[in-house]
Structures are given as C-alpha cells and as structure tokens.
C-alpha cells in the first residue's frame, strides 16, 4: 500500500511531542508538508527539526490554538490547509466529585471548542477545493468512561459528535471528516498520569503493567499503544485510499473498548 501525500499541506495541532509528533512524522514520511504546532517556539522548532531530520518537510507555527487569538494568528500563516489534524488535548486524573467548574470548562474548551474553531475556519476553503481531510484525535475515554476523568471523557465524546456533524456539513464536497479513537498510549504525559495512580517508586515497565491490570484491564493488547501506531491510522485517513470513509470514529485502542461495533 503506497500512501503519497506529496503537494499537500498538513496542520497537526499539539505536535511537539507524543501522538501529535508521531502524526507529524508519519504525514511527512508520506510526502506532506507539515506544520508543527505548539505554544512554545523553542519546542516547536525542535520538533520541526526532528521531522526534517527524518527526511520530511516541516515548519513550525508557535501559536496557542486553544484561544481565538492564537487560532487567528496561526491561520494567518496558513491560508490553505489540505489536512487538518486536531490533536491538541489535555487530561488529568481528578476524583469525580472534585472536578471543579473551571476544570470542566478548560477541558471542554481545549479538547473540544478549539477543534471546532479550526474546522469551522478551514472547511469553507477545503470544500471549495474538493479533496481535503479533517481528522480529530478522540479517545477510548469517550466510550469507556474512567471515573477519575469524567471531564476529559465528555470533551472527547464531544469530538465524535463534532466530526460526525461536520462530515454531514461537508457532504458531497470531497472533504472527509473523521475521528480516531486512541486507546491508552505511551507518551510522556501518560507516564506522568500513570504515576499519579500507581506507586511512584516502581520502574516504568512494572508501573505500566500495574496500571494496565488495575485501571485498563479490558485492553486486549495488555500494553500501552505506541504513538506511531496511532499515526499509522491518521496517515491512512489523510490519504486518497480513505476517500469513502467519512463521518466515522475509527478505533486504534488495542481492543480496549469491549464492543464489536465501531
């Protein structure tokens, strides 16, 4: 299977590390020109250089897309986006009854509204030009709700509705809009999260095993997913090979969601 994204410009939000960086690398390997995004210029430049070091074409856009102002600044630098990947997200473990109104608002704003803002801005030009892609990185927590992350789960559930709704809005234009349901994934942020829940003195491999057994026992992989495994699905969805896939929520969850349905 050959995926060729030559001549396409991709924007991956929150792509200085973890899943976002892996997605940027995957798209660049397939020939896309990738805009690496984050809030800190130094980290953005470092990530873009890493992508270029793999032989890809990448440049940095250091703007905070969780805000209206930051989004406007970014879009001024990127008047045309062929592949939009809304990867930006925050998460944290908080006991259900202790999640404050402010924490609810922040998760919904950063994980949900920020994606809506970018899709809304990019979709008109995408529809005018035909073939384009908008992909949202959702989470297994949208389907299997952890009691310590209800606010996060709500925001990621919203992303599934956002993708389905905008896919309907783009019907017949050649633009596809999908979400990817990412399962428990091995990133620096997730390592920190794991150590919030298990003994901090444990070596990482042991801590990971304890976390999976105690907090994610449904996983059929029985390990954390690697970011590149999420990126493989995103690269496919961004390609012409996925031309008939739209309005969907595709799972890369290691069998974590106990369902035979998508």
Q: Which functions belong to the PLM regions below?
A:
Residues 119, 155, 163:
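Active-site helix of classical SDR
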Residues 139:
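Residue(s) in the substrate-gating loop at a strand-loop-helix junction
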Residues 9, 16-17:
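Conserved glycine-rich cofactor-binding loop
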